[in-house]
């Protein structure tokens, strides 16, 4: 009783330091051998001595590829084609083009991304003086631009003789007119050895839309575009390759022999990274494909998966992956855990796989179960270098598909690649079932509410992540990981009542706006 009175009066000198320890460190938490989801966990706030704008979200996608924002769009046929991939890269992340299509269709999608934003365009579309205005019209319809250099041969490397832009062609009715009659021949050019900064300076001063780059013989070797100056100004976080300053883009493929032909075509198109798209990545097929890619296409990074255990990680790391994709049966449209009785709660899977893979400097992508900004922050806190989003981005203007209305709501279709609908189109390769007479679905088809454009939605996510890291007292993704593994960031397990308390409650009605 005397001890209790001392505590109540604040005079007790026998306080024990362990009484004041808040929460668990990550190792204590996951030694309990429970399977945790993101919602099961909460992180405790840290000390703030910097602004949210000072938070750096620069991170690794693979061993060799960096992103300016830890966001990746999923290779699903209702999520990522060229529009999504372009905008994800402009905003600092990356898009992975799905492969529920023909090789030719996937290659076209990749090329559209790589052509969208360039430093020096080393493979510009070129025409000859004998081509017609109708040829320019076809190029504009297919690629969306009409500023075309003209060489005597109609190919890169030919002698530059002119350039054709919309100013030369807009008001000419006869589209059979040859380009020699309308092209501009009084040209301002850059020399082959000029830097990108010098080329941009010339574009600014001459107020032209295109700047042909020529060698000492006057032969066309490259092209610089004024449009790209504007894009650099409007999208300073854009993720680009180091060599040509083109937007980064990834593509998915399978592990069949026919996928080697797809890989060759994707390599020619300039893809930066490929994801081996399988619901269960620890297979002989995937290990062999990883070795094939690293042996024959050393400049292309390969991400393996999906995995959820350390033994799966070990298997693919030994095969030579540059990154891993973690998650099995946790997506909103995925039924793998329910149907196959196989998978793992995502928070536990991310922590275990990230901790193991960190020994080999192999980054992981937390794939699935992302419904809120909080889930993104938790995935990063548990060791993921980036997060992959499907349902979060489905329903945006840039996602494939058309909007439709139901019960007054504007919706877009969203389906799992393991749904019967997607399997019929080709997604069954992902589930090793393309030869099965009876298909067993591991996903569903549904719809999601219109979210507007990713040009507004993704910056909202990025700002939210920055504020979340600020609350934890971490000024970068790297600092976050160090603080988690060092025990500075503390965790607690939330009871069911705590989860209710931590979400919207006790209201008759409310509205929830993303932006």
From Swiss-Prot:
The active site is at 334 (thioimidate intermediate), 430 (proton acceptor). This is Inosine-5'-monophosphate dehydrogenase. Keywords: CBS domain, Cytoplasm, GMP biosynthesis, Metal-binding, NAD, Oxidoreductase, Potassium, Purine biosynthesis, Repeat. PROSITE patterns: CBS, IMP_DH_GMP_RED. Residues 120-179, 183-239 form the CBS domain. Catalyzes the conversion of inosine 5'-phosphate (IMP) to xanthosine 5'-phosphate (XMP), the first committed and rate-limiting step in the de novo synthesis of guanine nucleotides, and therefore plays an important role in the regulation of cell growth. Belongs to the IMPDH/GMPR family. It is found in: Cytoplasm. Induction: Down-regulated by Legionella pneumophila infection. Its cofactor is K(+). GO terms for biological process: GMP biosynthetic process; GTP biosynthetic process. The keyword Repeat applies. IMP binds at residues 332, 367-369, 390-391, 414-418, 442. InterPro entries: Aldolase_TIM, CBS_dom, CBS_dom_sf, IMP_DH, IMP_DH/GMP_Rdtase_CS, IMP_DH_GMPRt. The gene is impdh. It is an enzyme of class 1 (oxidoreductase). Disulfide bonds: none annotated. Homotetramer. K(+) binds at residues 329, 331, 334, 501-502. GO terms for cellular component: cytoplasm; phagocytic vesicle.
